């Protein structure tokens, strides 16, 4: 854990400054490490930061991106106004480019009272997404309290209010991208009004956010205990408090009244309305009340034990980020799915069936019941549980829990109401619902989900089975990558692996994976490229039996006959954007894995207002090997059986009725 003492940071020259002119309250911190000479870092930084303002709006208030060693993010406070957020991020970006020019790392928390906005812009030459960053600290204390104030009482009331605000801010609101945010307004005994705002970057876990904010409160109490307001900022979290309502964050928020002063002790406390207090009356009132209370407590305890036994238990083995894995009781799942009734069945996959369920709370769930002998063994089951409980991204399906009682192996996911992508893109009656903007958003979302898996999560994961049927669509048609049963976890210093058991869906698998069992992040990039071309054409890859969609699209590209690639439903849409996406798709399906782009580059190219140059694609992969033919027998590091090649044509997919 990083230390929070400001004076133990030898590598940083802290330039935390406060401007409070015309209602602008801004704190920025620059590092003292300069760029290495003759590098493109400054050019990439100057190209990346100006793009944050528009992209943070498109991403609903939080945006992170990287470009050739520059890692940046932008964040606005919850309930922001679009133009105010855009201006705030743009101003913060320009401030960092001018005030921290030449520095490898900096961050800037900015707020503007008149515009009702606050925001963060942060950049670094080190990958920090999803990681708690406590240093360097920016501390901006305000004016001192009135010396006649009761500082001890103020400190106690402040600590109590701050602790409650920390709990609110660090409790994740999964309905919002800006999930870590809290404000409070209270009247203290000796202070008419105290307003607090706390926020964390959404890439943190709830426990990391809580720790970061508590460190801010502790630091504030140690250094600013005699002030009427101030700001303590860190790269991962922000705490500001003041004696007035700032940045529009407290509109329609009721102020908590001051605690009542303790009444003076009266010597005649046993006398009321001229009558002597009768001790025996206590027995008359308290005895039956005590019996009723004891019965009530016993009932509550019995109910809680029964509920815990029948419904759920929390797995004691929490994952590394402190989030416990929810282990569902089989009885609860049977109740939720009406004992796996046919009416609740949503679909059938290669590894089992998927059912819709409803928890006692009313929450809808999707229950994947793995079939015996399906091929998804105990290791694969644990693999998916361990991976998904440690992954949190809006473009990944959320695992709610699991059950492994007796012979049952069950995974419980969030219910995603709009089925999977293949139910729309390959259905003539539904494909028109996928407008160009919806398709673009789906493609971007899948790309961001893959980038998170490959680079931005605490793990490095290769999905290995990306395809249209493994992309689920929520109520607003936002994509969520699903099905991690075949995913492989890499160490951070690993880039590729080999296997003798090639699993996946033929047509989406990269040629080096099909032929040699070699897989890497570029294998997922290939699958993404196939899916992207399917989104443009509205055709399944397998419809091009003799050569495959990538090869077909490549031929039409070099012949200049792009009309035969494009879905007729897209004829009235921006041709330059469609061609750009075809180009990106062809780059992703190139025969040579080394020439395929990273998902980081794909995200950069997908920016609609970007000015980046996209390379020209080379020849796409021609994977025409039929399923009945096995590739050449080659030496592989994981060879355990004689058959070097086995294909699961249909892998487990969360399907929903059409």
UniProtKB/Swiss-Prot annotation:
Enzyme class: transferase
EC number: 2.7.11.1
Listed transmembrane segments: 282-302
Residue ranges of every copy of the Protein kinase domain listed in the record: 340-612
Post-translational modification: Autophosphorylated.
GO molecular function: ATP binding; protein serine kinase activity; protein serine/threonine kinase activity
Gene3D superfamilies with a match to the protein in the record: Gnk2 domain, C-X8-C-X2-C motif, Phosphorylase Kinase, domain 1, Transferase(Phosphotransferase) domain 1
Residue numbers on the Extracellular membrane side: 27-281
PANTHER family (UniProt xref): CYSTEINE-RICH RECEPTOR-LIKE PROTEIN KINASE 36, RECEPTOR-LIKE SERINE/THREONINE-PROTEIN KINASE SD1-8
Note: Seedlings silencing CRK36 show increased sensitivity to abscisic acid (ABA) and salt stress during post-germinative growth.
Protein name: Cysteine-rich receptor-like protein kinase 36
């Amino acid at each position: 854990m990083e230390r929070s003492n400001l004076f133990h940071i030898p590598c940083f020259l802290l330039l935390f400054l406060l401007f409070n002119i015309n209602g602008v309250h801004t704190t920025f911190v620059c590092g003292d490490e300069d760029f290495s000479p003759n590098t493109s870092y400054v050019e990439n930084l100057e190209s990346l930061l100006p793009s944050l303002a528009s992209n943070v709006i498109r991403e609903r208030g939080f945006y992170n991106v990287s470009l050739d060693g520059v890692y940046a993010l932008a964040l606005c406070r919850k309930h922001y106004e679009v133009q105010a957020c855009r201006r705030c991020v743009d101003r913060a970006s320009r401030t960092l480019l001018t005030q921290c020019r030449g520095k490898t790392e900096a961050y800037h928390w900015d707020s503007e009272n008149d515009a009702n906005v606050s925001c963060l812009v942060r950049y670094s030459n080190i990958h920090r997404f999803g990681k708690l960053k406590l240093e360097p600290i920016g501390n901006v204390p305000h004016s001192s309290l009135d010396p006649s104030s009761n500082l001890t009482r103020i400190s106690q009331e402040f600590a109590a209010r701050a602790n409650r605000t920390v709990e609110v801010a660090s409790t994740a609101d999964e309905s919002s991208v800006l999930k870590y945010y809290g404000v409070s307004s209270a009247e203290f005994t000796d202070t008419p009004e105290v307003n607090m705002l706390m926020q964390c970057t959404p890439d943190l876990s709830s426990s990391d956010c809580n720790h970061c904010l508590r460190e801010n409160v502790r630091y504030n109490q140690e250094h600013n205990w005699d002030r009427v307001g101030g700001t303590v900022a860190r790269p991962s979290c922000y705490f500001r408090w003041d004696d007035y309502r700032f940045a529009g964050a407290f509109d329609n928020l009721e102020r908590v009244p001051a605690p009542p002063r303790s009444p003076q002790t009266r010597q005649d406390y046993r006398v009321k309305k001229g009558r002597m207090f009768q001790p025996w009356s206590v027995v008359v009132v308290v005895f039956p009340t005590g019996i009723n209370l004891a019965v009530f407590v016993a009932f509550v305890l019995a109910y809680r034990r029964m509920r815990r036994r029948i419904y759920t238990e929390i797995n004691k083995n929490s994952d590394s980020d402190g989030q416990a894995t929810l282990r569902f009781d089989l009885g609860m799942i049977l109740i939720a799915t009406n004992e796996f009734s046919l009416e609740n069945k949503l679909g059938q996959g290669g590894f089992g069936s998927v059912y819709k369920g409803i928890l006692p709370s009313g929450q809808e769930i999707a229950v994947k019941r793995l079939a015996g002998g399906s091929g998804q063994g105990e290791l694969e089951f644990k693999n998916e549980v361990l991976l998904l409980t440690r992954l949190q991204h809006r473009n990944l399906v959320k695992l709610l829990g699991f059950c492994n009682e007796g012979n049952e192996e069950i995974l419980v996911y969030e219910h995603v109401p709009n089925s999977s992508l293949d139910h729309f893109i390959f259905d003539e009656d539904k494909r028109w619902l996928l407008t160009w903007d919806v398709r673009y958003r789906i493609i971007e979302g899948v790309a961001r989900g893959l980038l998170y898996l490959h680079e931005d999560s605490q793990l490095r994961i290769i999905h290995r089975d990306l395809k249209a049927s493994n992309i689920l669509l929520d109520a607003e048609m936002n994509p969520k990558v699903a099905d991690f049963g075949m995913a492989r976890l890499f160490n951070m210093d690993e880039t590729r692996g080999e296997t003798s058991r090639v699993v996946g869906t033929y047509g989406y698998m990269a040629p080096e994976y099909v032929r040699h069992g070699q897989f890497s992040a570029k294998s997922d990039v290939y699958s993404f490229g196939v899916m992207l071309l399917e989104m443009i054409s509205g055709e399944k890859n397998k419809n091009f039996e003799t050569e495959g969609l990538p090869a077909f699209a490549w031929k039409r590209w070099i012949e200049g006959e792009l009309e035969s690639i494009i879905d007729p439903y897209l004829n009235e849409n921006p041709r330059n954007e469609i061609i750009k996406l075809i180009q990106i798709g062809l780059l992703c399906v190139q025969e040579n894995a080394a020439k395929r782009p990273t998902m980081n580059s794909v995200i950069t190219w997908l920016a609609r207002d970007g000015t980046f140059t996209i390379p020209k694609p080379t020849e796409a992969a021609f994977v025409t090997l039929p399923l009945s033919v096995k590739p050449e027998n080659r030496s592989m590091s994981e060879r355990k059986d004689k058959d070097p090649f086995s294909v699961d044509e249909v892998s487990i997919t969360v399907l929903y009725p059409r």
